Amino acid sequence: MPNTKPRIVITMGDPTGVGPEIIAATLAEPEVRQCCRFLVVGDSAAMARGITVAGAALRVERTDTLNWEESKEGVLPLWEISSLTEADMQYGCPTVASGDAMYRAICEAARLCLEGNADAMATAPISKEALNRAGHRYPGHTELLAELAGAERVVMMLAGFRLRVTLVTIHEALADVPRLVTFERVLETIRITHRDLHRYFRRNPRIAVLALNPHCGEGGMFGDEEARIIAPAVAAARQEGIDAIGPLSADTLFHFAVQGAYDAVVCMYHDQGLIPLKLLHFDDGVNVTLGLPIIRTSVDHGTAYDLAGTGRASAESMKAAILMAAEMARVKGSGGGTP
């Protein structure tokens, strides 16, 4: 019988951070090895060092063919895209070479997915500074992947088993948020959230849409974005058959969301969504890029230079990202989620 386990390609992230070691720790776990077939895109020296730091019973095996065989016991299959020197891999000291290696790993993984040679990609954390020093001017994974995939609008979703949040604005100064919360952005965020939750998680997702201001603006006393922008966007989404409700006050909504009343919460700005998400899922939260033609999940943390090489970095978010990518690929392959 053909092997139907999802094919997950994993990028090594910043070789001077915790990426290689949390990947090694994750891929040594039977639960992960049994749920999917996997291939790491990265540097063999960096991954071998990561295996040692993690104390994983694995060895790197380089490959240049995509046969997607069942992963051999004790083997970490690697698609090599760089040959970093020891100087390029000093912990906490990203270089131009390491920044270029991160970029090439992301591009190669995206290419494999876009060409149908992998079912999903899961990414380890990168250094945005090193990426830019290497001449690749992107704020992060999301913007680079959107360009590679030709996606006009993407949405960041942070997810755990108790809560999913999506963001209308992401890395913006709080003072700029009211100007950036537009009817078009709110409606498009609701649409993409609905479409991809339908595609990868549930057939009929129920979506809560948060207010921007305290108490939904209190009838205009604390701002009018709710009446002028958010409520019309929710009404337009409902006209399209989307089960969206809002605007709702953020100070009470999350109490009901974590009890399962909603499948996702659309938030107006970064901290409005990430504070409750990280309160619940600090170790095992997953970053998912919605709006792409491919599945991309990632850890919900950074390079953690202070922990790199110590063996103390938690691999729970990396594990959750790979497991979620595999589950999303399975649901997509079966034609959609279940009600």
From Swiss-Prot:
Protein function: Catalyzes the NAD(P)-dependent oxidation of 4-(phosphooxy)-L-threonine (HTP) into 2-amino-3-oxo-4-(phosphooxy)butyric acid which spontaneously decarboxylates to form 3-amino-2-oxopropyl phosphate (AHAP).
Concerning InterPro entries, the annotation shows: PdxA (IPR037510), PdxA_fam (IPR005255)
Subcellular location per the Swiss-Prot or TrEMBL entry: Cytoplasm
Q: What is this protein called?
A: 4-hydroxythreonine-4-phosphate dehydrogenase
Q: Which family does the entry's similarity section mention? A: Belongs to the PdxA family.
Q: What else is known?
A: The active site is located at the dimer interface.
* Binding site residues for a divalent metal cation: H171, H215, H270
Q: Name one Pfam family in it.
A: PdxA
Q: Name one GO molecular function term.
A: NAD binding
The answer to keyword Oxidoreductase applying to this record is yes
Binding residues for substrate, per the UniProt record? H141, T142, K278, N287, R296
Q: Which NCBIfam families match?
A: pdxA
Could you tell me which Gene3D superfamilies the record lists for this protein?
A: Isopropylmalate Dehydrogenase (3.40.718.10)
Per UniProt, the keywords (alphabetical) are:
Cobalt, Cytoplasm, Magnesium, Metal-binding, NAD, NADP, Oxidoreductase, Pyridoxine biosynthesis, Zinc
Q: What does this protein's record comment on cofactor binding?
A: Binds 1 divalent metal cation per subunit. Can use ions such as Zn(2+), Mg(2+) or Co(2+).
Q: What is its EC number?
A: 1.1.1.262
The gene behind this protein is pdxA
- In the UniProt record, does the keyword Kinase occur? no
Q: Which cofactors must be present for this protein to function?
A: Zn(2+); Mg(2+); Co(2+)
Oligomer status and interactors: Homodimer.
Q: Which reaction does it catalyse?
A: 4-(phosphooxy)-L-threonine + NAD(+) = 3-amino-2-oxopropyl phosphate + CO2 + NADH
* The protein's enzyme class: oxidoreductase
Q: Which HAMAP family match?
A: PdxA (MF_00536)
Q: Mainly resides where? A: cytoplasm
